[in-house]
Design a protein with these regions (language model features):
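Intrinsically disordered, low-complexity proline-rich regions
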Residues: 20-24
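Sec-dependent signal peptide recognition
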Residues: 2-7
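C-terminal motif of bacterial Sec signal peptides marking the signal peptidase cleavage site
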Residues: 14-15
């Protein structure tokens, strides 16, 4: 299977010309009826490893390199299970067994290097979505997929939904943690040519055994029946800008009437939640209309060092130890993507205004590490 997968990845890099006679269906709605060996099921299972706005128009290929569905957006979906299905006659049991993945062009350059056991040759960083998780790996040992028996205690991670950053230069990830039990982005295969960043999303620990100990997790996403000016509601609204495994134990801060920062809840995990809407609530008496209006963000310590540098007009790398991360799962109220500080749509350049939904922000210590990334948010 490994040889087949390597051949397939090489074919992707030079272009495949074998296409299954199946028209593209621009939908990622419910699981199709029928056998899991069918083209229809595979297209659904593989493509939905990415968010719907990528899944709907990505190319989908099978394990042998056959193109099941031609895409238009530069992303490619495939099964990442090098062992193949446990039941070949009936296909993969589910999307998790398939280890479905959706990657951009640079991620396949990374994968080719990994499969060849050579240093990946890349033009820029690559990204891979795996919203159905994987089958497990030793976090510190490349080529350990499925080898739990020979993995030291505490090193095995079977991931749920996540996004991966495959760096052109692994040294750009120096300073990131290797601890996968905190919910923070963490480094896998540290110290090798295949070091990459794992970015957990909601449900990340659904397959992990034993589960990490995360206090207060059960009720972290339940909106309280309380005034939107209350500490109780603000704690919920601000903290849930991050996945539950971070939201449950982050510090939550607010501003008092005099503009002084106050702590609504002390946290334990190094993340801090706050409202980031500089305009304030449209209705000050009743507070934020909803969590979206508050524009809450949950950031790690390095992201706040970036924010401090931004407002001070200094370079972030003078105050940051590594890249920072900030979750905004309730989105924001909009800004100009090309001009810092433009928060009114009427002042924005035409075509540059973006009001974001749920997202995660990477705040780089060195902006040059993002060279080559697109500015196209459409």
């Amino acid at each position: 299977m490994k040889k087949i997968l390597l051949t397939f990845i090489s074919a992707l890099l030079i272009g495949c010309n074998t296409t299954a006679p199946k028209p593209k269906t621009n939908t990622v709605d419910g699981e199709p009826e029928g056998p899991h060996t069918s083209v229809e099921w595979k297209i659904w299972a593989y493509s939905t490893a990415a968010p719907s706005f990528i899944a709907a128009n990505c190319t989908v290929v099978d394990n042998d390199g056959t193109v099941l569905s031609e895409g238009t957006n530069g992303w490619t979906a495939m099964s990442g299970n090098m062992a193949g299905p446990a039941d070949p006659e009936n296909g993969y049991r589910d999307r998790h067994e398939a280890i479905s993945m959706v990657g951009d062009a640079e991620s396949f350059n990374w994968m080719k290097g990994y499969m060849d056991k050579t240093k990946p040759e890349m033009n820029g960083d690559g990204w891979i979505w795996m919203l159905h998780g994987d089958s497990g790996v030793d976090n510190f040992r490349p080529y350990s997929e499925g080898d739990k028996a020979n993995t030291p205690e505490g090193a095995w991670i079977e991931s749920g939904p996540h996004l991966m950053l495959m760096p052109k230069d692994p040294s750009t990830l120096d300073g990131q943690t290797t601890d996968f039990n905190t919910g923070s982005p963490y480094l896998m295969f540290e110290g090798t040519d295949y070091a990459h960043l794992m970015i957990p999303t909601e449900g990340y620990y659904d397959y992990q055994d034993p589960l990490p100990s995360i206090p207060n997790l059960e009720n972290s996403n339940v909106e309280p029946e309380a005034p939107h000016t209350s500490a109780e509601w603000k704690i919920w609204a601000y903290s849930t800008a991050a996945p539950s495994f971070i939201a449950a134990n982050c510090t939550v801060v607010d501003m008092d009437a005099d503009g002084n920062q106050i702590v609504l809840r002390e946290g334990t995990n190094g993340w801090t939640a706050m409202a980031a809407n500089p305009r304030g609530p449209a209705d000050p008496e009743n507070g934020w209309k909803d969590a979206h209006e508050a524009m809450p963000m949950v950031g790690d310590a390095q992201s706040f060092a970036w924010v401090s540098a931004y407002f001070a007009g200094t370079k972030p790398k003078t105050t940051m130890e590594s890249d920072g991360w900030a979750w905004m799962l309730h989105g924001d109220m909009g800004e100009d993507n090309t001009k810092a500080g433009v928060l009114n749509k009427e002042d924005s350049v035409e075509g540059a205004w973006i009001e974001s939904g749920p997202h995660l922000m990477m705040m780089p210590k060195d902006q040059s590490t993002l060279d080559g990334q697109t500015t196209d948010f459409i």
